[in-house]
Each structure stands twice: as structure tokens, then as C-alpha cells.
Amino acid sequence: MADGTINSEEMISASSFQRLIDIGIALSAERDTNVLMETILLEAKSLSNADGGTLYIRTPDNRLKFEIMRTDSLNIAMGGTTGKDINFPPLNLFDLETGEENHKNVASAAALTGNSINIPDAYENESFDFSGTKKFDEGTGYRSKSFLCVPLKNSQNQVIGVLQLLNAVDADTGEVIEFRPDIQPLIEALGSQAAVALDNQQLLESQKRLLDSFIELIASAIDAKSPYTGGHCQRVPELTKMLASAACEQQDGPFSDFELTDEQ
């Protein structure tokens, strides 16, 4: 930009930076976990122009659970708000017999090392086991080629999941290409935002569960004090739910405009 003009690459960079800011704001405001995870994957696919992708979440027993799957060209949409369960078993981060780290799978390797892995062509790669991918391709006629796996690290630098993108597509030719080096930092930045949002969401949910446990404990103690009011604290919430549900279903009358959000 020596002559004071802005070239196309700088415009794209500025646009992507603004896009990341907008995505970060949206992620921090989302309170539905399924919608949050879907947004993370869909925005990553959009930024990288990827045909498919998978979002894995790390479980307490050190496995990567499939949470969201998308492959546009095959019309595959599973997990999240779709209501379609993902039947693939979780990926083990450690061998169940030896306890050794599982670096054969590209997603588990990204989780274990904490580093992004960019593979131009899975069929030419000898570092990872893509036998499952090739079997999937044989059954669907698909051709899995380029992969980009990004670990999701929270504020404590702990890997809580993996974002895996599949088959970057050239916007001009429609050809499947490798994920460009300039795209990887964008996805990594998105991954950082996603990890913080997911971590905060998990923290909120754990706090809600703790609060619910305290309420149930107090209610049980109150009910146990008197044989005359036993079960009262258990019945009141159920009756309240029934009344609220009935009010929401009203099409006319004083409660026709009454509506509760999922969070409420």
C-alpha cells in the first residue's frame, strides 16, 4: 500500500478481521449449546469455503465425541438442532489396551499435540490412518481430499475439542483444493473464540446444575419436616410448568401474547 491504495488481499484481510469480530460477538451472546456448536462449525466452513466439517468435544474420559457434522455436497447435516443423531463412535485419545496416545487419527493427534494439522490430500498422506475416511468414500462416492484440524483451547490452554474442516473449494472453479496458509490463522482465531464461548457455556451449565441441586436439597428438607406438607415443594414446580405451558398455548384472550423463551 505504498501508493496509498488498498490492494485486494488487504481488503480481504480487513473483511475477514471484521467477520471474526462479528462472529465472536455472536458466539458470546449465544446461550443454546447446540446452536452455539452449529454456529462455530458453519462459520468456520464459510470462512474457509469448506464443503464439510465436524465439531468434536472432548469428554471427561478422554474421547472426542462427534457433536456436529456437515457435508454440503452430500446433503449431510447431523447433530445439533437437526435432531439427527450421529452414530459414529467417539474417537479414543488413548489406546484402551496400552494407554498410549493415539496419533494415528488426525483429529486425536490435533487434540493431543495442541497443534493444527493441515493435510493437502488424505490419499497421499502416510502420517495418519485414513482407512475410515476411505471406507466412507467408497460407500458414498465422495472424495475426501483436504483436511484442516484445529484444536479448541480454552483460557487455561486446555484442549476441549477439535474443529475439523474437509475439502476446501476454490470459489472460482469449484475444484477441491488444499486449505490455503492464509486461511489457517483465521480458523485458529475462530477456534480460540469458540473454545472460550464453549468453556463459558459449560461453566454456566455446571453452575445451573449446582443451583438446581441446592434447591432440590432444600425443598426435600422442607418437605421432610412435616407429614402434612410432604411433597409440596415437589408438586409446585410441576404445577407452575403446567400453568405456564397452558398460558403459552392460548391463541386468544388475555394470555394470547404470553410467550416464554427456552431459557426462561
Question: Where do the model's predicted regions map?
Answer:
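Signal-transmission linkers at sensory-effector interfaces
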Residues: 1-39, 46-47, 67-70, 203-217
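Signal-transducing coupling segments at domain and membrane junctions
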Residues: 65, 102-108, 115-146, 168-178
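GAF sensory/regulatory domain recognition
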Residues: 54-101, 124-125, 163
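Histidine- and acidic-residue-rich, metal-dependent catalytic cores
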Residues: 213-264
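Signal-transmission/dimerization alpha-helices at domain junctions
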Residues: 2-3, 112-116, 162, 185-205, ...
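Short, hydrophobic-rich beta-strand element in sensory/regulatory alpha-beta domains
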Residues: 42-45, 51-58, 62-68, 107-109, ...
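Regulatory loop-to-helix N-cap segments in sensory/regulatory domains
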Residues: 2-12, 138, 143, 158-160, ...
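A short, aliphatic-rich beta-strand micro-motif
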Residues: 145-156, 161
